[in-house]
Amino acid sequence: MQTNSSLLNLDVIQIQHYQQNRYPMLFIDFVKEALPGKYAKGYKNFSFNEWFFPAHFADEPNVPGFVQVEMLTQMFLMTFLTLPGNKEKKTSFVSISNAQFKRKIVPGERVDIESTLSFYSRGVAKGKSVGTING
């Protein structure tokens, strides 16, 4: 849903119009605000029934690192896939720098994600994503 001429607000169905990730690999629930070519803000809610919790780990469920990286990456994708002509383009990443995991994410928590795009040219993007737990 477009809120003005350039600022976007997207639910999970609308997100799928921009990127190719689908269940069980879609790890963002809502894009609260996206300014194409600049930034995207949104969140992911983790409920106890996520497919990975029974295996990671039964006695102390927490979100696997690869899911956390993918979640941050998917919000970053929204900074440039929302640009005209980029809808549903296939993407891949070459490197991740300075990744830090401060603590476990457990069932019932929400991760708020802010991504900024610092460079985009000829299909190559560079930027930053930060996730904070429960605001």
Question: What is each PLM-predicted segment?
Answer:
Residues V31, N62-K87:
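Active-site helix/loop of acyl-thioester processing domains in fatty-acid/polyketide metabolism
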Residues Q2-N9, M75-E114:
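Hydrophobic beta-strand-centered segment that forms part of the acyl-chain substrate-binding groove
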Residues V31, I96-N134:
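Hydrophobic beta-sheet segments that form the core/acyl-binding groove
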Residues M1-N62, K89-K90, I105-V106, S121-R122, ...:
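Non-catalytic linker/capping segments at the edges of enzyme domains
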